[in-house]
Regions:
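Glycine/proline-rich, positively charged
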Residues: 25, 35, 83-178, 182, ...
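N-terminal binding-site loop/beta-alpha segment at the start of enzyme catalytic domains
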Residues: 2-72, 133
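Conserved short secondary-structure transition element at the edge of the structured enzyme core
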Residues: 228-291
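Structural preference for beta-strand elements that scaffold enzyme active sites
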Residues: 11-15, 43-44, 71-77, 106-111, ...
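Conserved, mostly hydrophobic/aromatic
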Residues: 16, 45, 60, 74, ...
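Glycine-rich, positively charged active-site loop/lid region within alpha/beta enzyme cores that binds
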Residues: 14, 188-245, 270
Length: 291
């Protein structure tokens, strides 16, 4: 029997990332993957308003429609890149559309997907508080904010009696460790749990790409921002070193990448940290969950 690392060792929980749902993953496969994920004892799903023109949320709404809402945790994100700002009208408009797509009256976590330099953060947080009081979300999350911004946000929320963020979703893997320097100490101090996205560096750590010239159809062709983030010579050089070490120790690069996150990174089950697991098909999902 495969050892389920996420449940039986450090207990770093997996969260099913749905960025591929509605693009590389059709509705039938979305349902299968969601059901399989839950059958393995996991119950947390992560989506966003911007994922695939709303189809990720629509598919999740259909996949979860017959399941008791108390049996799963559902997160979505509002994004300033849609309207150019995160004020009350923009957040409300996006969230109402998301709730309709997701076929629910409330999400467990509402993330601010990216910082909005055009709207004072006080205004954004006041808007979140008003929406929270209406019962449309249970927890406030942050994603892609700096350590300094997190400190400021927590201070504003504390001083005004507004719901403070309880979860932070950030880029983290064996190749990208910037968050360890400033962000992690801040979120530990403020009692915020951390969810790591891109655990396989968008696929670079899957072993699928051998060089900077080896791009094939997938995330790097479908999402240009991923190519900008990872398609660099230094990443490929690092992967070659890791692959050599993995080969010498009879372990796959994917397994080593997840084992590093679970056993040797800053993630810690006592803080209820998690790893966003994104997959393009059910076989990849099972593989990523069963090393």
């Amino acid at each position: 029997t495969s050892l389920k690392l996420f449940h039986k060792t450090m207990n770093i929980k997996p969260v099913l990332g749905t960025m591929n749902f509605g693009l590389q993953v059709d509705l039938a496969e979305t349902v299968r993957m969601s059901e399989t994920f839950q059958s393995m004892g996991y119950n947390e799903f992560d989506t966003a308003y911007v994922y695939n023109d709303g189809y990720s949320e629509k598919y999740m709404g259909k996949a979860l429609k017959d399941i008791d809402e108390h049996k799963y945790i559902l997160a979505t994100k509002v994004n300033p890149r849609i309207t150019g700002k995160l004020d009350l009208d923009s957040i409300s408009d996006q969230l109402m559309k998301s709730l309709k797509r997701l076929n629910t009256k409330c999400v467990d976590i509402l993330y601010l997907h990216f910082p909005d330099p055009s709207t004072p953060i006080y205004e954004t947080l006041e808007a979140c508080s008003k929406i929270y009081k209406k019962g449309y979300f249970k927890e406030l999350g942050l994603s892609n904010y700096s350590a300094h911004e997190v400190i400021n946000i927590c201070s504003i929320c504390h001083n005004n009696g507004w719901p403070k963020p309880t979860v932070y979703q950030g880029l983290y893997n064996v190749l990208s460790r910037d968050i360890e320097k400033e962000l992690v100490p801040v979120i530990r101090e403020t009692g915020i749990r951390f969810y790591a996205y891109n655990p396989l560096a968008g696929g670079i750590l899957s072993g699928k790409y051998s060089s900077i010239d080896s791009v094939t159809p997938g995330r790097f062709t479908l999402r240009p921002n991923y190519k900008d983030r990872y398609w660099k010579e230094e990443f490929f050089n690092a992967v070659k070193i890791l692959e050599k070490i993995c080969h010498e120790n009879n372990i796959s690069l994917i397994e080593a990448s997840f084992r590093w996150l679970i056993h040797h990174s800053v993630l810690n089950n006592k803080y209820d940290d998690g790893i966003i697991i994104g997959s393009s098909n059910i076989d990849h999902l099972l593989q990523n969950l069963s090393y």
